[in-house]
UniProtKB/Swiss-Prot annotation:
Family matches, as PROSITE patterns: RRM, ZF_C3H1, ZF_RING_2
PANTHER family: CCR4-NOT TRANSCRIPTION COMPLEX RELATED, CCR4-NOT TRANSCRIPTION COMPLEX SUBUNIT 4
Known role: May negatively regulate the basal and activated transcription of many genes.
Positions annotated as zinc finger (C3H1-type): 199-226
Protein keywords: Coiled coil, Metal-binding, Nucleus, Repressor, RNA-binding, Transcription, Transcription regulation, Zinc, Zinc-finger
Organism in which the protein naturally occurs: Schizosaccharomyces pombe (strain 972 / ATCC 24843)
Lineage: Eukaryota, Fungi, Dikarya, Ascomycota, Taphrinomycotina
Protein name per its UniProtKB record: Putative general negative regulator of transcription C16C9.04c
Region of interest: Disordered: 246-268, 458-489
Polar residues composition-biased segments: 246-261, 466-479
Record domain RRM: where: 116-198
């Protein structure tokens, strides 16, 4: 049992190295213990310490003596086990290298977007050549955007170009400098030629693909795995060149650089989408105090006309109550209407116009809903009963209904009644029939309904005084009538 335990079979101990020379301890040294503390070193280091140094154990500082050395010869079984372990280790190492090599084989066809590499195409061969490399690095050209590590001319593109355009790869020290250069150069004109700039792509180094050390210290190819989202195949790049440019152009807004997602194969705009003037007006604090109405068409046509006129081909947009006009919107045109609070244009004496619409509506309802007098039953006033019933049946505007539309309807009724009267400049007086028609017209503003009813249904004994003129302004047949607004009685 003791012999089995002493057999050196631990995999961790197989990889044990000498703590002094850091060399792998051979199988013949694994059973060698030069000190009683158990601190193991190879026999070469033990002999060097004993002969050339102080001869003490590096761990416990005891003197190395021949009597304290513990050593056991290696058996044939241990040799076989050690040989089998070495073969297995070599086999695993070979498989690991093959897996890495197979994983890197497909990388030979991959191109990775390099964020510090700018590719400029469209330069003149007189400028972009091997003799002017130092000039291109200077502040007059690409050096003004940042420190340049290397400039390489794409000779293959120059040879295949029919227009003689040359492409140049500029490797900057910082990614921000490359983004600034691309944003400034792309779309510019140099020597009558339009320049195009974008991020450049690079490939993996052949030594890296073979899992070898690269012998070129200034190699500009990749020696480590690139970002997957920035990787493209040759077929992808070829198809994108025939459709739309690769999204390798940065977005620079207000000095900040935003790199577009390489997974999107299309360019993104350099500048942010600006708001339209109408959107800016809506977002501004001043626009919160205005009511904006828009109709999506082409040309604006706004006509400010009095609210008394109507048109079947126009849509009336009522103005606020403080305004004395409405807006007619003609269909087929775009209209942007800003309703501002306007001061009244009426004289100060017209205090009735300053009343709110609700007060006017309440007065009109009270005037219409009043019951007629007993004199309405008289046979001589039967002709006025339909007029009073018509006045009662008149539809008054509700609280939500627009007062302007109701006034338009009332004036239209007056105009239709006046159309029966013939006006002439030859005569100086109206005939009796025309005077009766004028007197039977209802008033435009009713503030004293009782006086109107008394005027319409006067008693029969006072009918004889109908044609007599009133004695004073505001007095008719002895019954008080409120004078028109803005006048003194």
């Amino acid at each position: 049992m003791l012999k089995t335990q002493e057999i050196y079979s631990s995999e961790d101990e197989d990889d044990m190295c000498c703590p002094l020379c850091m060399e792998e301890i051979d199988i013949s040294d694994k059973n060698f213990k030069p000190c009683q503390c158990g601190y193991r070193v190879c026999r070469f280091c033990w002999h060097h310490i004993k002969e050339d140094l102080n001869g003490r154990c590096p761990a416990c500082r005891r003197l190395y003596t021949e009597e304290n050395v513990q050593w056991r010869p290696v058996t044939a079984e241990e040799w076989k086990m050690d040989l089998h372990r070495k073969n297995e280790r070599k086999k695993r190492e070979k498989e690991r290298k093959e897996v890495e090599l197979s994983n890197r084989k497909h990388l030979a066809n991959i191109r990775v977007v390099q964020k510090n590499l700018a590719y400029v195409n469209g330069l003149s061969p007189k400028v972009a050549n091997e003799e002017n490399i130092n000039v291109l690095k200077g502040p007059e050209y690409f050096g003004q955007y940042g420190k340049i590590i290397k400039i390489a001319i794409n000779k293959k593109a120059a040879a295949n170009s029919a227009n003689g355009h040359v492409g140049v790869y500029i490797t900057y020290q910082r990614k921000e400098d490359a983004a600034r250069a691309i944003a400034a150069i792309d779309g510019s004109v140099s020597d009558g030629r339009h320049l195009r700039a974008s991020y450049g792509t690079t490939k993996y180094c052949t030594s890296y693909l073979r899992n070898q050390q690269c012998p070129n210290p200034s190699c500009m190819y990749l020696h480590e795995p690139g970002d997957e989202v920035d990787s493209y195949t040759k077929e992808d790049l070829a198809s994108l060149q025939h459709t739309r440019p690769l999204s390798t152009k940065p977005n620079v807004v207000n000095g900040a650089t935003h790199s577009p997602s390489p997974s999107l194969p299309f360019k993104t705009p350099l500048l942010p989408v600006t708001k339209t003037p109408l959107e800016e007006a809506n977002s501004s604090p001043a626009a919160q105090n205005q009511h904006i109405t828009t109709v999506d068409h082409v040309h604006p046509q706004v006509s400010m006309t009095p609210s008394l006129s109507t048109n079947n081909t126009a849509t009336s947009v009522p103005a606020p109550y403080s305004s004395a006009a409405s807006v007619n919107v003609v269909p087929g045109h775009a209209t942007t209407i800003l309703h501002h609070e306007e001061s009244s244009a009426l004289p100060p004496t017209a205090a009735w116009a300053k009343l709110s619409p609700s007060v006017l509506q309440e007065r009109l309802r009270a005037a219409v809903n009043q019951q007629p007098l007993d004199a309405l039953k008289s046979s001589s006033t039967q002709t006025s009963i339909p007029k009073i019933q018509k006045l009662k049946a008149a539809k008054l505007p509700s609280e939500e209904e627009n007062t302007t539309k109701w006034l338009n309807k009332a004036i239209n009724d007056l105009v239709s009644s006046l159309s029966k009267i013939n006006f002439s400049t030859e005569g100086t007086e109206f005939d009796k029939k025309q005077i009766e028609m004028i007197q039977n017209l209802p008033p435009l503003f009713v503030f004293n309904a009782r006086s109107v009813i008394d005027k319409e249904v006067v008693p029969e004994q006072e009918k004889s005084a109908e044609n007599q003129p009133p004695t004073s302004l505001g007095i008719n047949n002895g019954n008080p009538v409120m004078p028109p607004p803005g006048f003194q009685s």
